[in-house]
C-alpha cells in the first residue's frame, strides 16, 4: 500500500463524514445552540464548569485517546491493511462517532448525568443498576491496568531493565510530574481570566516545549514500581475529587498539544518518507487470512523457533483469532469504544458550554482518533518484517519505531530517529496518565449513581446510601480496588476487557436509541451499530467461554485463570442478553415519557 495515499485518502473521507453525516445527525436529534447546558444551569465549580470548546476538546480527546487507537490497528494488522482501514473508516464514521456524539447529547438532555441515568429514565431502574455494576467494575479494571502501565513506564530497576530503559523511564516520569505541577499553577493563574484563544494556545505550546526539554535533560526522579503505584493512588484520589478547573482541564489541555504534536510529527514522517520513496509502498498485505495467529514468522512466512527453548517465538504486538469477531474487538478506540460513552456522559457533558459544540468535541474527537489509527497502520507497515518476526515488545514500540524511522528517511533528519522515538513513547505514556485519572473520576460517578434510590436524586439519599454516595468515600473505594488489583494481578481478567468494553458500547448505543425513540426523534441510525456490536460481543464471549472450558477439561494452561475468565464471560453474556431484551422492549414497545 502507498502510505501517503492511504493517509490522505482516509483523512478526506473522515472530513466528509464529519461535515455530511455529523451535520445530518445534529439536525435529526435537534441540537439547539440557544438551550442552556447543564454546565451553565448547575455550575458548582467542581464538576459542572462551563468551558471553552478548544479546552474541553483537549480534555475529551486526551481522556479517550490513551494507547487504544495505536494498539488496536497495530495488533489487528495481522489480518491485512484493507480490513483494518475499512473498519476504522466505516466504524469510526457510522458507529464510533455516532456513539460518542449520542452519549454526550443524551447526557446533556439528562442534566449532565451518565449513561446509567439515561438507562434508568428510559428503560428501567433494574437495567440501570446492572449497567452501573458492570460499568463500575470495568472502570476499576481500567484503573488497575493504566496504573500498572504508568508505573511500569515511570519505574526504574524493573526486571531485565537496562541503563537506557531506566533513563527513558526517568525522563518520562520527570516530564509527567512537571506536567501535573505546572498544570495546577496554570489552572490557578488562568482561573476567571479571559485569555484570547491564540495567546492561550501559544502559551500552552511554549510550556510543553520547556517541560519536555527540562524533563528530558534533567531526569531527577528515580523510584521503583511499588512506590509509583502508591504515589499514583494518592494522585488519582486527589484528582478525582478536585475541581476540574484546577487540574483536569489545564493538564489535559496542555497534554492535548503533546498529542497534536505527535500527530503532526507522524504526518510529516509519513508524507516525507513517501515523497522520498522510502515508504511509498508499505509491506502489509492487503489481506492475509480469516484466521490469524500471533506466532512470529520470518520474511518467507516460516515460524521462528527460539533455539533456547525449542518453542515458537510469539509476536507480542499482534492479535490472534478469527477475523470476526477479533478485528472488531481489537480495534476499539480506533473505531468504537464503550469507554468513550462514559467519558462523554461523565466529565465532558458537565463542562460543555453550548450544545453546538457537542458535534466537534464528540463526533470530531472520535474522527481524530480514527486518523491516529490510520497513522498507526502506516507505522506498522514501514516495519512489517520486524513486526512479523516478533521484534517489538509492544504495539507502542511498533508505532514509535515505524514513525521515527520514517522521519529519519527525510533528508536533513537522518539523526532524529532516537529522540523522535523517545518523544513518541512519551506522548503515548502521557495519555495513559490522563485516561487513568479520568477513569477514576468516572468510577466515582458510577459508584455514586449505583446507590441513588430509584426515582430520587443523589441529595435525597439517606443512611448508608448517603455515605456511599459521598464523593470522597466513592473515590477512596475506587482507588483502593483499582490500585489493589493493579498490584495483585489484573492480568488474569484483562483478556476479557476487549469484549467488556465493546459491550459497554453496545449498551450505550441501546440507551441513546431508547431515549431518542421515547422523545419522538429519529433513532434508526442506531439500529445497525447497536445490533452489530451486540452480535460481536456475544460471539466473542461465547468463543472465550468455549476456549476456557475446553482448556479446563483438557487440563492445559492455568486452571485458575481459565476458570475466572470462563465465569466472567458467562456473567457478561447473561448481562448483555438481559439488558438487550429490556432495551428492545423499550425501543420497539410502548414509549415512555422522555427528557426533551
For the regions a language model picked out, list residue spans one by one.
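Extracellular/periplasmic helix-exit of transmembrane alpha-helices
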Residues: 271-313, 367-403, 438
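Membrane-interface "cap" regions at the ends of multi-pass membrane proteins
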Residues: 13-70, 256
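Extracellular loop-to-transmembrane helix junctions
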Residues: 2-19, 76-107, 116, 171-179, ...
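Selective recognition of specific alpha-helical transmembrane segments in multi-pass small-molecule
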Residues: 10-20, 135, 139-144, 206-211, ...
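A generic transmembrane alpha-helix motif of multi-pass inner-membrane proteins
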Residues: 1-17, 204-255, 268-275, 299-300, ...
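Loop-to-transmembrane helix boundary motifs in multi-pass membrane proteins
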Residues: 125-140, 364-371, 416-420, 449-487
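Transmembrane helix-loop junctions in multi-pass membrane proteins
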Residues: 2, 69-70, 82, 141-163, ...
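Membrane-interface helix-loop-helix modules in multi-pass membrane proteins
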Residues: 49-110, 121-125, 142, 147-158, ...
Amino acid at each position: 500500500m502507498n502510505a501517503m495515499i492511504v493517509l490522505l485518502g482516509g483523512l478526506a473521507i473522515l472530513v466528509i463524514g464529519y461535515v455530511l453525516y455529523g451535520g445530518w445527525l445534529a439536525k435529526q436529534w435537534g441540537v439547539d445552540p440557544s438551550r442552556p447546558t447543564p454546565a451553565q444551569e448547575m455550575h458548582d465549580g467542581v464538576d459542572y464548569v462551563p468551558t471553552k470548546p478548544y479546552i474541553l476538546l483537549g480534555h475529551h480527546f486526551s481522556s479517550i485517546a490513551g494507547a487504544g487507537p495505536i494498539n488496536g490497528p497495530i495488533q489487528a494488522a495481522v489480518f491485512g491493511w484493507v480490513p483494518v482501514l475499512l473498519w476504522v473508516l466505516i466504524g469510526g464514521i457510522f458507529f464510533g462517532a455516532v456513539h460518542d456524539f449520542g452519549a454526550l447529547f443524551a447526557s446533556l438532555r439528562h442534566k449532565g448525568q451518565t449513561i446509567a441515568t439515561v438507562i434508568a429514565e428510559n428503560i428501567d431502574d433494574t437495567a440501570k443498576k446492572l449497567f452501573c455494576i458492570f460499568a463500575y467494575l470495568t472502570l476499576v479494571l481500567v484503573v488497575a491496568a493504566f496504573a500498572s502501565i504508568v508505573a511500569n513506564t515511570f519505574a526504574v530497576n524493573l526486571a531485565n531493565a537496562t541503563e537506557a530503559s531506566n533513563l527513558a523511564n526517568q525522563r518520562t516520569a520527570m516530564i509527567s510530574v512537571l506536567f501535573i505541577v505546572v498544570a495546577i499553577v496554570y489552572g490557578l493563574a488562568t482561573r476567571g481570566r479571559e485569555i484570547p484563544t491564540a495567546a492561550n494556545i501559544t502559551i500552552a505550546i511554549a510550556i510543553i516545549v520547556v517541560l519536555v526539554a527540562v524533563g528530558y535533560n534533567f531526569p531527577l526522579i528515580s523510584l521503583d514500581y511499588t512506590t509509583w503505584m502508591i504515589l499514583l493512588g494518592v494522585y488519582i484520589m486527589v484528582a478525582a475529587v478536585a475541581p476540574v478547573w484546577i487540574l483536569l482541564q489545564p493538564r489535559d489541555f496542555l497534554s492535548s498539544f503533546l498529542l497534536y504534536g505527535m500527530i503532526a510529527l507522524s504526518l510529516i514522517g509519513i508524507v516525507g518518507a513517501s515523497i522520498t520513496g522510502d515508504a511509498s509502498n508499505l509491506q502489509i498485505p492487503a489481506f492475509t487470512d480469516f484466521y490469524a495467529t500471533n506466532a512470529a514468522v520470518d520474511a518467507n512466512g516460516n515460524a521462528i523457533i527460539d533455539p533456547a527453548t525449542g518453542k515458537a517465538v510469539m509476536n507480542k504486538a499482534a492479535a490472534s483469532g478469527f477475523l470476526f469477531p477479533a478485528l472488531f474487538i481489537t480495534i476499539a478506540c480506533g473505531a468504537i469504544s464503550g469507554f468513550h460513552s462514559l467519558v462523554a456522559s461523565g466529565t465532558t457533558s458537565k463542562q460543555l458550554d453550548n450544545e453546538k459544540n457537542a458535534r466537534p468535541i464528540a463526533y470530531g474527537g472520535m474522527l481524530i482518533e480514527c486518523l491516529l489509527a490510520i497513522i498507526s497502520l502506516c507505522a506498522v507497515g514501514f516495519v512489517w518484517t520486524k513486526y512479523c518476526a516478533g521484534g517489538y515488545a509492544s504495539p507502542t514500540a511498533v508505532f514509535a519505531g515505524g514513525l521515527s524511522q520514517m522521519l529519519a528517511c527525510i533528508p536533513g533528519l537522518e539523526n532524529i530517529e532516537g529522540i523522535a522515538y523517545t518523544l513518541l513513547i512519551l506522548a503515548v505514556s502521557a495519555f495513559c496518565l490522563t485516561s487513568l485519572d479520568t477513569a477514576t473520576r468516572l468510577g466515582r460517578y458510577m459508584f455514586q449513581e449505583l446507590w441513588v434510590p430509584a426515582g430520587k436524586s443523589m441529595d435525597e439519599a439517606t443512611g448508608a446510601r448517603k455515605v456511599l454516595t459521598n464523593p470522597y468515600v466513592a473515590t477512596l473505594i475506587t482507588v483502593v480496588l483499582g490500585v489493589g488489583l493493579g498490584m495483585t494481578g489484573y492480568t488474569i481478567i484483562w483478556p476479557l476487557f476487549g469484549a467488556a468494553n465493546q459491550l459497554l458500547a453496545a449498551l450505550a448505543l441501546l440507551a441513546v436509541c431508547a431515549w431518542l425513540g421515547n422523545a419522538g426523534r429519529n433513532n434508526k441510525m442506531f439500529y445497525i451499530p447497536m445490533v452489530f456490536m451486540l452480535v460481536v460481543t456475544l460471539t466473542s464471549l461465547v468463543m472465550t467461554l468455549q476456549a476456557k472450558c475446553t482448556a479446563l477439561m483438557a487440563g492445559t494452561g492455568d486452571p485458575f485463570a481459565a476458570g475466572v475468565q470462563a465465569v466472567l464471560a458467562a456473567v457478561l453474556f447473561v448481562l448483555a442478553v438481559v439488558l438487550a431484551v429490556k432495551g428492545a422492549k423499550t425501543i420497539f414497545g410502548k414509549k415512555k415519557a422522555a427528557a426533551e
